[in-house]
Amino acid sequence: MSKLFEVLERLAATIETRKGGDPTSSYTAKLLNDPALAAKKLGEEAVETVIAAVAQGPDALASESADLLYHWLVLVAASDVSLDAVADKLAAREGTSGLAEKAARPS
């Protein structure tokens, strides 16, 4: 198993402990209390990740990817979507052509 998955599992658990926390003393609690803000931050991090990928090199991409994954985990938690629900969606798509899967989605 990749070290990434172990780190993400620990990070997700830490994020869960911040639910109900004081948003004035915890950035994570602040995002968890405001899913729209969490979504905005994820969007910003996605753009920064793309910029790093095309213009800043591997180290910047790794750093921005870490920020992106953190903010994604926070948004999922803030929206009360379990990681298992996301995993189920991914598992259901395994073995299916990306083009076929996308075409089968409801509009």
Curated annotation (Swiss-Prot):
GO terms for cellular component: cytoplasm. Its main location: cytoplasm. Pathway: Amino-acid biosynthesis; L-histidine biosynthesis; L-histidine from 5-phospho-alpha-D-ribose 1-diphosphate: step 2/9. GO terms for biological process: L-histidine biosynthetic process. GO terms for molecular function: ATP binding; phosphoribosyl-ATP diphosphatase activity. Gene3D superfamilies: MazG-like. Its EC number is 3.6.1.31. Pfam families: PRA-PH. HAMAP family: HisE. This is Phosphoribosyl-ATP pyrophosphatase. It comes from Caulobacter sp. (strain K31).
